[in-house]
């Protein structure tokens, strides 16, 4: 809301201007109560962004408390820019995932690019050097021209920013479903490396210490971005384009280097990214955490546009900006470091004893608000919850095994589904080798980055099958955690912890809140069983377009530790003659499956079942087998079932595979039962592997590039290269065809 003349406090009240900023009548009354007076325009702007769901988690806080957040590896849990876990030898890894869904729906290139930039700043604000980027993306039906436009420009935005800033984009996931046609999801994850002694916090301690502004100038882009991210997308969505920020990755690169050098200086007290809610959130949160206040002179804020008001400066979400608190008397030393990198470093205020955020503009106090009122005293809502009618209907359904009349044609059709097909079209646009530490590039179950000058590596992944979560939020939430851990273990790593991005519809609808609550219950249970605490994350609610919500999509970003290079494992067959094992039990479970979507065009019925103790044990024995040197390749069996996992095992290798199926073929190939791995083992170790894991030997890797399935009543034989052409060509074909 950009006005030439700002409304008076009386107009704000009488014309309910606060409601256009996302505040309810009750919330406005609470602001008046906290201040002891009616707020002016700048002040109500501060409250509107800080009390948005995006900043305050006012609708999700009671739910988030269910997550386990501590563990043997956790050095920093939720509450700072990113979580941090210990990896031994005084070293640690910081990581976090965040959403940029609403901006990407309006301006896909900049929305995605600035999502990447923001998550990078969260990582280096902790003192960590960013070493890898991942993402999790959701789009609608790829036959639609608007969806193609969004998909293409989001991928370009991620690539454009990540490639220019010099951080490898090494992994992620992309899924397509009509549920996301009006509301795409763009979740960005960053991983950073740090030594224990360099860990920083966003805190404003020490009365008289200086508050310094570092980085790019402030413009009018992104004003009310946090509020925009906390409401449904309506018919007027395109008019919200000014709420989308504009990024500069080259400025970000300079900011990374400047801040990582400043962090080594003893005069630095605290540092925080000016992310959602810009100067408002960074100043209020840093002061509140320290039990202090901040006074800022807004005349000193570097501006790239003329005539900016306090309201605009405080609510701007211009990118590539950081707020520092520096010990008094050392400002010149910090400025010297920052200006060496060609950036602004300007004292704009200082820490004060009074616990207020005081903003001075042109010699007058433009706003004065208690910092706790902004940061800690935001209202928290316990929303009503109601089981949706669709869920009860699905639960009442009897499980049905689909009929497949043409097995070979159906198999190819599954491989050509955009959610299952190769994502090479996506990741070949990303520079995944910059920094030259990428050991396992996109395409395997998890990416692997080596830690230089050590034997250690990090495995990382993002995962969520939202169709399962829609069918049964509690089970689907647990499966999201379990599948992420499965991908980490299949890469030879021990899962350490996770970060989550909870993408849901409106919590104001009791059925929507029930989905959120149940999904978190399931995730929390899986986290406890698998010993993967939640160290941070993001909540993105109101993902609805014209009243239609997305599937509940709790994306899990997970990192694991590989102790030795010989433990690194990929999902690709290595040599002919290796024995192919299937770990885990296959049941007739087709609810939410690729086959169900292919045949019915929608999901229904029951989500796959999940026995968490069995999941834990299966992962444990596989990781042990990998560390014992018995495994040549390991692949999680997930979406598409064995029909996807089996050919993926040999795609790009020149090998084939010959397996025997002695159960129902449709179930064996297309069921999406959980807790399963495909594993290849040198035949010399096959007996030992079978004893250790109770795995079932189903076939061998062959020299001939042929996929052979021997069933009791038929023989299926297909050319691997032909299947690979179908799998590799699907997304490029969609993107070059006319809608």
Curated annotation (Swiss-Prot):
Compartments, as annotated in UniProt: Cytoplasm
Pathway in which the depicted protein is active: Purine metabolism; IMP biosynthesis via de novo pathway; 5-amino-1-(5-phospho-D-ribosyl)imidazole from N(2)-formyl-N(1)-(5-phospho-D-ribosyl)glycinamide: step 1/2
Binding site for ATP: 57, 96, 500, 537
Record Pfam families: AIRS, AIRS_C, FGAR-AT_linker
Catalytic residue list: 54, 100 (proton acceptor)
EC code: 6.3.5.3
Chain coiled-coil ranges: none
Catalytic activity: N(2)-formyl-N(1)-(5-phospho-beta-D-ribosyl)glycinamide + L-glutamine + ATP + H2O = 2-formamido-N(1)-(5-O-phospho-beta-D-ribosyl)acetamidine + L-glutamate + ADP + phosphate + H(+)
Role played: Part of the phosphoribosylformylglycinamidine synthase complex involved in the purines biosynthetic pathway. Catalyzes the ATP-dependent conversion of formylglycinamide ribonucleotide (FGAR) and glutamine to yield formylglycinamidine ribonucleotide (FGAM) and glutamate. The FGAM synthase complex is composed of three subunits. PurQ produces an ammonia molecule by converting glutamine to glutamate. PurL transfers the ammonia molecule to FGAR to form FGAM in an ATP-dependent manner.
Subunit structure: Monomer. Part of the FGAM synthase complex composed of 1 PurL, 1 PurQ and 2 PurS subunits.
Protein name: Phosphoribosylformylglycinamidine synthase subunit PurL
The organism's taxonomic lineage, starting at the top: Bacteria, Bacillati, Bacillota, Bacilli, Bacillales
Gene symbol of the encoding locus: purL
């Amino acid at each position: 809301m950009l006005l030439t003349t700002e409304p008076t406090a009386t107009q704000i009240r009488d014309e309910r201007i606060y409601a256009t900023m996302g505040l309810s009548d009750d919330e406005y009354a609470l602001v008046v109560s906290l201040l002891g007076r009616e707020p002016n325009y700048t002040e109500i702007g501060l409250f509107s962004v800080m009390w948005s769901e995006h900043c305050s988690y006012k609708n999700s806080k009671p739910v988030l408390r269910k997550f386990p957040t501590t563990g043997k590896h956790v050095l920093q849990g939720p509450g700072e820019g990113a979580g941090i876990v210990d990896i031994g030898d005084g070293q640690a890894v910081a990581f976090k995932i965040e959403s940029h869904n609403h901006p990407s729906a309006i301006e896909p290139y900049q929305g995605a690019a600035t999502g990447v930039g923001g998550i990078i700043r969260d990582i280096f604000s902790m003192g960590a050097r960013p070493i890898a980027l991942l993402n999790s993306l959701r789009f609608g039906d790829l036959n639609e021209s608007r969806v193609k436009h969004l998909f293409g420009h989001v991928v370009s935005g991620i690539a454009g920013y990540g490639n220019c800033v010099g951080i490898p984009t090494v992994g992620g996931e992309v899924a397509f479903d009509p549920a996301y046609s009006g509301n795409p999801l763009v979740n960005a994850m960053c991983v950073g490396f740090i030594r224990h002694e360099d860990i920083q916090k966003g805190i404003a301690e020490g009365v008289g210490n200086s508050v310094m502004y570092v980085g790019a100038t402030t413009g009018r882009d992104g004003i009310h971005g946090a509020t925009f991210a906390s409401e449904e997308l309506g018919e007027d969505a395109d008019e919200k384009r000014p709420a989308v920020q504009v990024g500069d990755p080259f400025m970000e690169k300079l900011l990374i280097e400047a801040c990582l050098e400043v962090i080594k200086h003893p005069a630095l007290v605290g540092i925080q990214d000016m992310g959602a809610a810009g100067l408002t959130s960074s100043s209020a949160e840093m002061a509140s955490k320290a039990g202090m206040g901040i006074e800022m002179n807004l005349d000193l804020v570097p501006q790239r546009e003329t005539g900016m008001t306090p309201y605009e400066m405080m609510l701007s979400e211009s990118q590539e900006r950081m707020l520092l608190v520096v010990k008094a008397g050392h400002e010149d030393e910090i400025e010297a470091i920052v200006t060496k990198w060609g950036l602004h470093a300007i004292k704009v205020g200082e820490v004060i004893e009074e616990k207020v955020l005081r903003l001075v503009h042109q010699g007058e106090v433009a706003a004065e608000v208690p910092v706790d009122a902004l940061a800690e005293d935001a209202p928290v809502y316990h929303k009503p919850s109601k089981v949706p009618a669709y869920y009860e209907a699905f639960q009442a359904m009897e499980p049905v095994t689909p009929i497949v009349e043409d097995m070979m044609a159906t198999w190819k059709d599954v491989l050509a589904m955009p959610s299952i097909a190769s994502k090479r079209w996506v990741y070949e646009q990303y520079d995944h080798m910059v920094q030259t530490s990428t050991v396992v590039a996109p395409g395997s179950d998890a990416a692997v980055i080596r830690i230089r000058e050590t034997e250690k590596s990090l495995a990382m992944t993002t995962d969520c099958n939202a169709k399962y979560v829609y069918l049964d939020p509690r089970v689907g939430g647990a499966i999201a955690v379990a599948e992420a851990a499965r991908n980490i273990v299949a890469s030879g790593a021990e899962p350490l912890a996770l970060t989550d991005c909870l993408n849901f519809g409106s919590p104001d609808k009791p059925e929507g809140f029930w989905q959120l609550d149940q999904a978190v219950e399931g995730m929390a249970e899986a986290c406890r069983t698998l010993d993967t605490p939640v160290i941070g994350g993001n909540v993105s609610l109101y993902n609805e377009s014209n009243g239609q919500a997305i599937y509940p999509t709790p994306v899990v970003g997970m990192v694991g530790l590989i102790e030795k290079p010989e433990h690194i494992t990929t999902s690709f067959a290595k040599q002919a003659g290796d024995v192919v094992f299937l770990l885990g039990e296959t049941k007739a479970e087709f609810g939410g499956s690729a086959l169900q979507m292919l045949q019915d065009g929608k999901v229904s019925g029951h989500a796959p079942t999940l026995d968490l103790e069995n999941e834990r044990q299966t992962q444990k024995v596989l990781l042990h087998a990998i560390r014992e040197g018995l495994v040549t390749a390991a692949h999680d069996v997930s979406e598409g079932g064995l029909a996807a996992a089996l050919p993926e095992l040999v795609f790009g290798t020149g090998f084939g595979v010959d397996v025997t199926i002695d159960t129902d073929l449709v179930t064996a190939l297309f069921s999406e039962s959980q807790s399963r791995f495909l594993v290849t083992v040198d035949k010399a170790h096959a007996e030992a592997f079978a004893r250790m894991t109770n795995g079932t030997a189903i076939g061998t890797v062959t020299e001939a590039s042929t996929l052979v399935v021997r069933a009791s009543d038929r023989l299926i034989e297909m050319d691997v290269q032909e299947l690979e052409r179908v799998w590799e060509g699907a997304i490029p074909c969609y993107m070059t065809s006319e809608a």
